[in-house]
């Protein structure tokens, strides 16, 4: 699991890696753990690792690189750590003027579940293999996850967010205010999502504030995070998770799943409302992550009792159907009082099969 980190004040472009200048340095430092190239113009390449060996001309011929940094007049511009690649692969790439082999070297370093963090200017970062976390921070960034299930945080600026293959998420978890973010119509995005465009993104994650998240016509996973969020799945079979706060959830067409992972997700003034729970579309309410009984060890499933009153046994799930609303209640400690509740904005006759317990 490698880490690539960019320093503020430097605009980093990962596609610009070109090791062909390594043999044209002004001075060199060669030890078993350090290969350092000073180009005499303020720029320095520094490779750290183990078992470095050199031939009679001073060219590196063996060992493993585990860290790589670029410096400009003593200021580190970026560094890569935590990965590894054979010295011979970097040395081989340095002997060609094509950048494709240089990019392949970096792709090998970033083949795992890596963390890439940009800085305050426009960056270009590529995750390659694995389930990566890529954060652009400031600037108008181009962020590409490639393979795996990636989480991409554009940050401030108008960012191009491309998940590549896998199930990928555009996240606004670090946003300083709530956002409007839409996979179907990103032109309407606001705040830190403004100007962002999405390619091959299946999921959206909100901030710690009130967000409005919209899916597209595919199957999406929308996660509100903290705050009173509004989530709309649109088309496709969507999974919606409001998180904490009084959230409003709209699945849209097709079979949708409304997910609750903790009692705090929908309790008291933070109770969630499902605006379009539709039996004909086989919508489901997923409570499987919640331990239904605090009286027993482990994660217990709820016992569905329909419209019957709580009996005093921990783990019961019931509902009340009104003229235009339905309320779902859960008792996890057996005191006959609801510890968790969900509001359905319609009169719905429920059955056990509509829940994932």
What is the meaning of each model-derived region?
Residues 2-14, 29-32, 37-40, 47-64, ...:
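Extended, solvent-exposed, non-transmembrane regions
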Residues 71-126, 204-205, 213:
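Extended, small-residue-rich solenoid/repeat segments and analogous flexible loops
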Residues 11-56, 67, 255-357:
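Acidic glycine/aspartate-rich repeat arrays in secreted/surface proteins
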Residues 106-111, 249-250, 348-350:
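N-terminal helix-cap/turn-to-beta initiation motif at the start of protein domains
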Residues 43-50, 74-90, 180, 197-200, ...:
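Short amphipathic beta-strand/extended segments with alternating polar/hydrophobic composition
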Residues 1-27, 117, 122-199, 210-303:
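Acidic, glycine-rich calcium-binding repeat modules characteristic of RTX/beta-roll
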